[in-house]
Structures are given as C-alpha cells and as structure tokens.
C-alpha cells in the first residue's frame, strides 16, 4: 500500500539515524565544486525533471508533512505544490512536452504549463490499491516507452498483486503494460545510459530474517530477465548463478546501516548513485552520500558526502548533479 511505502521510507530514515549526525553546513563534493541549495520544501524528494529552467519534483510524505508534485520556478528556491494533484508522488519525468508523474497506483500525464499550473491532464494507467502495490521511478527508454518499477508487497517473499517485484514498460498513449524483467524485490529508480536499450535499476535487498546477508543491487533490466527474488537474493552468488538467474551489474553488501541505493543517474558511462544509508568502512559508516561508479560495475567512489539526512534523489541535468535528502532540500553541484 502507499501507506506502507511511505512508512518504509520513514523506517529507512530511522535505520540511517547515524547519518543525521553529519557536520553542520552543506554537503561536500570530492571534485572541489561547491554544493549549493537548489530548492527547499519537499518532504521526501524522490525524482526531479525539467521543462527548460522550471523544475518539477516528486515528493513522498514524511510524518505529518504531505508530499506530492512540486515545481520550482526559475530564480526561486521555494518548491510549491502543483495545484489539484495528490499529496503523494514517487516519480516524475518530462518527455516531448509532457510531464509524467507517478502518484502511487496512478500515473498521470500533464501538459499546458502556465508557470503555476497545468491546463490539461489525463490518466495514463491506474490500479485499485487492493490489486496493486505502487509504481516507482519513471524514465523513458529510447524506444519511446515509459519504464518504471513495481514495488514490493512482502519483505522476503513474492508479491501476489499485479506486476509485483518487476520492471515494466508502458505505452505512452494507450497505457498498455509490458513486463520487462522479474525477480526484483524492490526496484526503485532507473536510468538509461546513452546507447543502451535497457535501464539500469536500483533494487533494495530484503531486511529479514535478522542478520540477512542479502545485498542491495544495481541491475540491467533486459527483456525477459529474471533476477531470482525470492528464490535467490544474491547473498550466495554461486547458488544464484547455478539457477541461471541474471546477474546484477553490481551489489552493495548488507551492512548496518544498509547502503540502500535509491536515485541513479548517468553522465556518459559514469553513474551517480544516491545511497540512503551510505557505505561503511573500517572506521564506521560514512553516512548518506552520492557515489560514482561505471555503468558496467566496478570501483565505487565517494562523490558527495556530509548530508545531514538520508539522501534519495540523484539526477544529472545540464552539467549539474541534483541531489535531494530527507531534510526537504534539493542541492546541486557541477559534475
């Protein structure tokens, strides 16, 4: 349910409580460029999209603060709610003059932006909550179809609701759905590397039973691929390989706090990944951060650290990396 997903986000914040003790001030980027506040006022910023210099941000709720679809006007740093939209949103993307927004069990398409509201909107696809969990991040593929993940129903077993534990693609006109990849516990955000027909997807590993070694994943969601969940959670790579499940591009080992890859975005072959809990070293947890790696997997490097709260959003646009955390702020840095 949406309530369960919202609760899960808040629960992740509790898991990553060590991250909230970061030093005061702004996050710090390894490239030496200053990190600046781009916008404030979004409870749980999950995804950002741009129409020219206007930004649209999807926001989940946090405690008593509603989420929803927000906009940030050029020259302003205050996020405002788009009128007549629901108080919860988990994904947003701009494509060919239209804004696509995920309100949990409904994806709507907007156009005719006046600077303060949209003049037109329609429902692209809708499910009843009793039959469906939720959509996650939104991203268009080079084939012109809208890709998204479908959320978990249970922590460590397969969901029984429509399309649960899968990545799907949607026809942007008819709303017809096609299953792309299955066996994914909680696919979250997606990105397409230039030249690739399949998205890279962040996937959150299971939390139970206590002490589970199930890692978080980044996968390449190719048509027909099965990544094994719940039969395989990639805590035993050899066992998963013997069962012929498709291998993830990379894994983040289980830790406390959990790394929890959320937002993912590409600049060429380089990936920027938002880690809700961050990596852990011999000296202890780094805290929420943005890391870089290759679209083929490989070395993971710290890129932006020092967030005061768990970080969810990562989006590369126009020479800047945009990042958002549970303090309600969206930042940007040249990257």
What role is predicted for each listed range?
Residues 105-140:
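Asp-box/WD-like beta-propeller blade repeats and closely related beta-sheet repeat scaffolds
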Residues 67-96:
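Blade-loop segments of beta-propeller domains
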Residues 34-40, 78-84, 122-128, 176-181, ...:
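A short beta-strand motif characteristic of beta-propeller blades
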Residues 23-29, 135, 151-158, 162-175, ...:
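Beta-propeller domain segments
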Residues 3-14:
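Bacterial N-terminal signal peptides
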Residues 58-60, 102-104, 149-151, 202-204, ...:
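Residue-level marker for isolated small/hydroxyl-bearing positions within beta-strands
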Residues 15-21:
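Sec/Tat signal peptide C-region and signal peptidase I cleavage site
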Residues 41-54, 85-102, 129-146, 182-198, ...:
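Beta-rich, blade/repeat-based domains predominating
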